[in-house]
């Protein structure tokens, strides 16, 4: 069996060039292929597949803009090492109308949100290739202060574990601390308070888990993450409009302003500063810049004749490391996650690399790479995620592989993403009681209520009204609902418009419902 396994491995590895399924001979008989079976897709590409698909992108983009109402969109395609399409649609900021300098073009800079994870993965791949770290390097070797709730996991958890979301940390652990304005180190320190699922066999998507791994790589390099990324990836690729620093994004004149979806309209109401989780969600870039990165990934780590990432270090990132979307029936294909990349198999039996990015406050992004077709596409929007970039790239991938669009992708993705806009809180949709119970004197609620995880909550009184402060960002009036129950409204990345916070006082205790999902929402005076 060992000999057989070795032979099969050799068969798979003997030729890694993109190949097509054999086409029938002139006599109509099938032509047998000598390409290793794992490299053969289920069907050949249509003639002129990429050119024909590119020719339809303008109409696809226009249609999706009309259906969704998103303010701005930019799209680019790389094929054969060249940019074959790059164009913008719509506007950067709806307040400025259709002025020429407000129109989106291929150089307009967007926030990429979680597409940043894939870019960060290639930064790490560079470092792995020069033997600065390994995907299997334990994080505590570089960050001695880092800890999770299980000492054994703390000792073993590696850079690769955190880049593949298999550390056992809960889904989006730490994100709500970021919403409150805490800095990166504070959030990473609090990861030790999180309960863990089984190590290396559980998948749960975490921004700050990945960020901790990136921080370890940066410390190992002796420079901040944003500087490391500049030095080993962005500058060598000539990505002059790309940065991990939110300040750089804000300083650019040609930037797309984020728009949030409120009451059926998109409005530029909020600013999303992702610096605390920059390796996971902080990149800003244009589609023209992103074509350089896509070309590098398609070329197995090389760009313009220069090796950016060692192919052996890049390969683990773009191949499955854990099942992220298990099949629900035998005939279904499972989805996988590599190191910072979604990895799957299309219905044409082609490997597909992808990632989406989503900021509720105003960014929706996606890229798709089909290595066997030597093509990649990226789509960026400046609006609450609605499925537009995913639908556009999926339609393009269908056209490349089949010559036609085979699903109503916008309907599928729009339905999938709709829950992101759902307000949170048990009092949402309820009317205040007609005859509320009287509350205690306002002064009796005043004070500082302590919580080891969320930090101190400060309740103050001004002109007979109560105010709540928590972290650096939450500062809201408290409105009496009934008795010792008060409410507040606050919009953040994880608290969409219409959400209602519930604050319940009980002597020297204050329970904030929004922060109590896992039982940690009680503060003590």
What is the role of each PLM region?
Residues 89-93, 151-361, 365-366:
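Short, surface-exposed loop or secondary-structure junction motifs
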Residues 69-72, 361-364, 453:
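Short, small/polar residue-rich loop motifs at catalytic or cofactor-binding pockets
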Residues 47-110, 129-134, 141, 149, ...:
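Short, conserved catalytic-motif segment at the N-terminal edge
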Residues 10-13:
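C-terminal motif of bacterial Sec signal peptides marking the signal peptidase cleavage site
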Residues 15-22:
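Bacterial lipoprotein signal-peptidase II cleavage site
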Residues 15, 394-525:
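Peripheral terminal and inter-domain segments
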Residues 1-2:
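Bacterial N-terminal signal peptides that target proteins for export
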Residues 365-382, 511-513:
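Short, well-ordered beta-strand elements
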């Amino acid at each position: 069996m060992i000999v057989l396994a070795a032979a099969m491995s050799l068969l798979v590895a003997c030729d890694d060039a993109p190949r097509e399924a054999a086409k029938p001979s002139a006599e109509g008989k099938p032509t047998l292929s000598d390409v290793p079976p794992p490299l053969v897709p289920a069907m050949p590409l249509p003639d002129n597949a990429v050119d024909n698909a590119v020719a339809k992108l303008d109409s696809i983009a226009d249609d999706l803009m009309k259906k969704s109402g998103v303010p701005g969109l930019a799209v680019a395609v790389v094929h054969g090492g060249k940019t074959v399409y790059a164009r913008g649609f719509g506007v950067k900021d709806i307040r400025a109308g259709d002025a020429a300098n407000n129109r989106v073009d291929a150089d307009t800079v967007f926030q990429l949100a979680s597409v940043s994870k894939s870019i960060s993965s290639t930064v790490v791949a560079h470092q792995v290739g020069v033997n600065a770290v390994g995907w299997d390097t334990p994080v505590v070797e570089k960050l001695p202060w880092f800890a999770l709730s299980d000492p054994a996991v703390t000792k073993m958890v590696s850079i690769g574990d955190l880049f593949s979301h298999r550390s056992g940390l809960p889904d989006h652990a730490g994100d709500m601390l970021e919403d409150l304005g805490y800095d990166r180190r504070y959030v990473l320190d609090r990861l030790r308070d999180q309960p863990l699922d089984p190590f290396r066999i559980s998948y749960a998507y975490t921004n700050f888990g990945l960020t901790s791994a990136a921080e370890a790589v940066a410390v190992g390099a002796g420079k901040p993450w944003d500087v490391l990324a500049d030095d080993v990836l962005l500058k060598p690729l000539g990505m002059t409009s790309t940065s991990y620093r939110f300040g750089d994004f804000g300083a650019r004149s040609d930037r797309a302003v984020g728009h949030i979806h409120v009451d059926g309209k998109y409005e530029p109401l909020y600013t999303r500063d992702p610096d605390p989780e920059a390796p996971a969600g902080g990149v800003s870039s244009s589609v023209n810049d992103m074509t350089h990165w896509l070309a590098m990934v398609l070329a197995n780590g090389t760009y313009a004749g220069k090796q950016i990432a060692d192919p052996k270090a890049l390969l683990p990132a773009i191949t499955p490391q854990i099942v992220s979307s298990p099949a629900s029936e035998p005939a279904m294909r499972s989805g996988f996650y590599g190191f910072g990349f979604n990895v799957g198999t299309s219905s044409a039996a082609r490997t597909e690399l992808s990632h989406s990015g989503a900021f509720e406050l105003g960014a929706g992004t996606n890229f798709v790479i089909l290595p066997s077709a030597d093509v990649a596409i990226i789509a960026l929007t400046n609006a609450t995620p609605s499925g537009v970039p995913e639908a556009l790239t999926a339609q393009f991938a269908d056209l490349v592989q089949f010559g036609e669009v085979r699903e109503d992708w916008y309907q599928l993705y729009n339905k999938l993403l709709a829950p992101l806009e759902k307000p949170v809180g048990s009092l949402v949709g309820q009317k205040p009681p007609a005859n509320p119970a009287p509350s205690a004197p306002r002064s009796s609620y005043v004070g500082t209520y302590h919580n080891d995880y969320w930090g101190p909550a400060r309740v103050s009184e001004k002109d007979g009204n109560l105010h709540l402060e928590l972290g650096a960002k939450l500062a809201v009036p408290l409105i009496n609902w009934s008795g010792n129950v008060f409410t507040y409204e606050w919009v953040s990345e994880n608290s969409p418009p219409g959400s209602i916070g519930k604050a319940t006082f009980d002597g020297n205790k204050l329970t904030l419902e929004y922060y109590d999902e896992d039982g940690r929402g009680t503060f003590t005076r």
